[in-house]
Amino acid sequence: MKYLILSLVANLLVFGVLSAIGLNINILAAMMIVLVIPIMISGIVFFKTNIDKTYIFFNIIFIDFYYYIYNVHLMTLPKFNNYIKTEMMELEHIDVLITSKDFGFDEILFFTLYLLLILIVLYYLKKQLKNKT
């Protein structure tokens, strides 16, 4: 249980730092941090815990919640619309569609499936490592 709490607090800190940085970061860097750092924290701590399925469930729920709050926070910032326009001009050669005030179910579903897939792979990897020892 302590590892579950450790993971949730560490991920909360990551999203807290990202919220504090706000719009002072490149949008691609923010996307990569959101996709990579929380799953790295969860994956590393996952190998320490004994409550695998509970750990996976609560991590997905809380990371989705943190992600949602982070995005809502960014969209309510006064400079958000100008930030999106500027970033889209810089990303003209990369096919990324980012619109203002358009955060919804499909993003949460993608993020949930992404986390679930990686944590299931880690679950089976952990299971195989236990069987070898």
UniProtKB/Swiss-Prot annotation:
Task performed by this protein: Accessory element involved in the expression of sarA and several virulence factors. Modulates SarA production and/or function in a strain-dependent manner. Affects the transcription of the accessory gene regulator (agr) and genes encoding virulence factors including alpha toxin (hla) and protein A (spa).
Predominant localisation class: membrane
TM regions (residue ranges): 3-23, 27-47, 55-75, 103-123
The UniProt record lists the keyword Protein biosynthesis: no
Originating gene: msa
Gene Ontology terms: cellular component: plasma membrane
Topology relative to the membrane: Multi-pass membrane protein
Name of protein: Protein msa
Compartment(s) of residence: Cell membrane
Keywords recorded for this protein, A-Z: Cell membrane, Membrane, Transmembrane, Transmembrane helix
